[in-house]
Amino acid sequence: MESLTLQPIARVDGAINLPGSKSVSNRALLLAALACGKTVLTNLLDSDDVRHMLNALSALGINYTLSADRTRCDITGNGGALRAPGALELFLGNAGTAMRPLAAALCLGQNEIVLTGEPRMKERPIGHLVDSLRQGGANIDYLEQENYPPLRLRGGFTGGDIEVDGSVSSQFLTALLMTAPLAPKDTIIRVKGELVSKPYIDITLNLMKTFGVEIANHHYQQFVVKGGQQYHSPGRYLVEGDASSASYFLAAGAIKGGTVKVTGIGRKSMQGDIRFADVLEKMGATITWGDDFIACTRGELHAIDMDMNHIPDAAMTIATTALFAKGTTTLRNIYNWRVKETDRLFAMATELRKVGAEVEEGHDYIRITPPAKLQHADIGTYNDHRMAMCFSLVALSDTPVTILDPKCTAKTFPDYFEQLARMSTPA
């Protein structure tokens, strides 16, 4: 297996313009494909997940052109539901941001479509979404294991009264919200259980509004969506920088700044993960906000005990930042780490112990006490981009760290390690 050893880093300083947000990129691509008119998307993320979405749209007959660096996409919308040219199988890798929304959107047509992906995708639950789509009339079969992909879709979704479980993934609700306006009937979506990752629903609603569709949101417990609507292209749309990707650089600034400035997001960003900066501030770093930047300056870091449900992806970065904080850090209400690219709670606990931390892994929390001195270890990344990026922070000590399968960052940030090196002064 390929590996990358990062030597100790004395200081991190400078600015980085963030790649486009994965969450925003894939939502914007799907809405542009469903919309009337041509959309020009700029600062689109070039990554595995986005390529899977683009390949699927291409197979569904959507025409688009990409710039040489793949960050600008000119896409001609279908002006309604996506239509397959006959029976079709779409391979979506391990891209939840493609699998969930497409599973819903493709229930509007009548063709037979199979959605499948990598082995890990077949372990990521989708049963709650399928149950909700079936309540709206969709005809869906599981082809292997009940409640998991691959799925066979045969259209039939018309809207109506639908319940969705919000406790596992907000992507299920996102998928229903984006599909419902195109259904023939009005749709009322009721959310059961505590809605996780609520800020991601705000991204969805914000993008739908940009494409001309507004819905009634009753305290995130009930959503009323008029049927028979159309999305309309906004013309040009700038994808904001990826706030989850910003977390590694902001954390590096907190631990070994200098000052690190990330551009492409700021105080007006629609992504909930910008709240990660507030957590670093609570830990002792200094944060400066602009309209299109966030800067972090080193401070003496101390441990925190916090509910992280609102920033589940960026919260992983706090788990490795905790190695540099005084005291024991507890991250709570993070059960949905277990159903991401890998079981992130198990993976994080396992790898933190390798570098010497004392770790308590609960059902939905993790408690981390840093060692007096970090140990050099080979870090397993579990084919999870965030594990690789989180553990790069270990090098901000006087100990090297070896990252196994470093190319897994291609899911959201293909040149992450080059960018980190560019801003780092070796010890």
Swiss-Prot record:
Superkingdom, natural source: Bacteria
Signal peptide interval: none
EC number(s) recorded for this UniProt protein: 2.5.1.19
Cross-referenced SUPFAM superfamilies: EPT/RTPC-like
Gene Ontology MF, one: 3-phosphoshikimate 1-carboxyvinyltransferase activity
Protein residues bound to 3-phosphoshikimate: 22-23, 27, 169-171, 197, 313, 336, 340
GO BP term, pick one: amino acid biosynthetic process
Major site of localization recorded for this protein: cytoplasm
Substrates-to-products reaction catalysed: 3-phosphoshikimate + phosphoenolpyruvate = 5-O-(1-carboxyvinyl)-3-phosphoshikimate + phosphate
Keyword terms: Amino-acid biosynthesis, Aromatic amino acid biosynthesis, Cytoplasm, Transferase
InterPro entries: Enolpyruvate_Tfrase_dom, Enolpyruvate_Tfrase_sf, EPSP_synthase, EPSP_synthase_CS, RNA3'P_cycl/enolpyr_Trfase_a/b
Oligomeric form and interacting partners: Monomer.
NCBIfam families: aroA
Similarity remark: Belongs to the EPSP synthase family.
UniProt-recorded name of the protein: 3-phosphoshikimate 1-carboxyvinyltransferase
Species whose genome carries this gene: Salmonella paratyphi B (strain ATCC BAA-1250 / SPB7)
Lineage, uppermost ranks: Bacteria, Pseudomonadati, Pseudomonadota, Gammaproteobacteria, Enterobacterales
Gene this protein is translated from: aroA
